[in-house]
Amino acid sequence: VGSEMCIRDRNVMEKDNYQWWRRRFCKMAEYFTAYRIDHILGFFRIWEIPVHSVHGLLGQFVPSLPMSKEEIQSFGLRFQPEFMTKPFINDYILNTMFGERSEEVRQTFVQHVHHDIYEMRPEFDTQRKVEAYFAGKTDEADLDLKEGLYSLISDVLFVVDRDNPEMYHPRIAVQNDFVYRQLTGQEQEAFNRLYNHYYYQRHNDFWYREAMKKLPVLTQSTSMLVCGEDLGMVPDCVPWVMDQLQILSLEIQRMPKNPEHEFGHVSEYPFRSVCTIGTHDMSTFRGWWEEDRSVTESFYYRELGHWGDLPEHAPGWLCEEVVRRHLYSPSMLCILTWQDWTAMDESLRNPDIEIERINVPANPKHYWRWRMHITLEELMKQDAFNEKIRNMIAESGR
C-alpha cells in the first residue's frame, strides 16, 4: 500500500480514527497475510512541492517546524530576506549558466535591479510560468535554456513557509548552488549547522508523534505482517517507530543504512527485515554491475573478497553467489526479483539488460512495461534451473 494518506486531509481522517484506511486493510486481510507500506516516511512527513514549481527543490516538509528570523540568527547567520529568499542572480551567474545566450536572458527573462544584480521579470518569476513560455518548443537549445531558468529560480537559501510568511525552511541541497557560494566561510559553517539541525535533528520527536498517531491504528487493525519501505533520507525517528510497532525494514546492499558503510553487510541484517537485491525502482543486479565500474570494483574485491580481473558483465556464477548470500541472511524474508533469479543462468536470462528494469523514477516519461521474456510454460520446462532454486532455498533453511 502507498502512503498517499499523507497528501489527503489529515484532520478529517483523524476524526473518525482513520476508518477509511482500517476498512481497506480489513478487506486486504481477506486475501493477504503480509503487505508492504511503500514510502513509509510519508506517514511521518511528506515533501510538498508548491503548485508554481516544476522541480522539487523549492518544496518543504509537511508537517514541519519552520524557523523564525530570530532562530536562524541564533545559529550565527545574519538573516537577509532579500538576498536569502529570492533568486540570487548576477552577471557572473548569467554568464556561467547561459554562456552565449546570457544576453538573451538579460533582455527577456530578468530585469536589472542595481549594480550587477538582477531579478526575474514578473512574467517569468515561477517555474510554471517559464514552463508555459517554452510549451511546444522541442529544440535542445531551448530545453537547456528552460532548465537553466528553472535552476535560476530555485537559487535561494531559504524557502518561505506555505502558511506563515514570517517563517522559513532552509532549501534542500542548496550547498550545490550559486547563492551558497556567495556566503563567507564563516557564514557557510553557520548555515551548515542550521541545515543539519533542521534536516536531521529538529523534527525527530515531532515526526515520531505524527507517525504514532496513525501507524499503530493501521498496523494493528489486522493480523497481517507489515513491511516498510524505509529507504532514502530517513530521519532517526523512523527506525524508532518501526521497531516499536515491529514493522519489518527493507534492506538493500547497495543502499546501506549505516552511512559509514559503502555496502550493507548482508550477514548483519536484522531479523525483522526483508532483504532484496533491488526493488522495482532500481536497476537489476546485472544492470547495476555495469553502471559504475569503480563501485562494482569495490564490491567485487572488498565486499565479496574476490581477486583477479573484474568481469565486464556480471557472469552467472557471480549472480548466483549474490543470491546465495541473500538467502543466508538473518532477514525474516528474502524476496528477490525474477530478473535477479534468472541472472544466475546465462542461457536463460534476458540478453538485453536494459529492458529488465521495471521503473525509472527519475524519468517522468518512463512507464512500467516490463514483461517476462519467456512464457511460464517455457520456464516450467527449465528443470535444471528450477531444481537449483529449489535446492538453494532448502539449503539456506528458508
What annotation goes with each model-predicted range?
Residues 3-4, 8-398:
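Catalytic cores of glycan-processing enzymes that make or break glycosidic bonds
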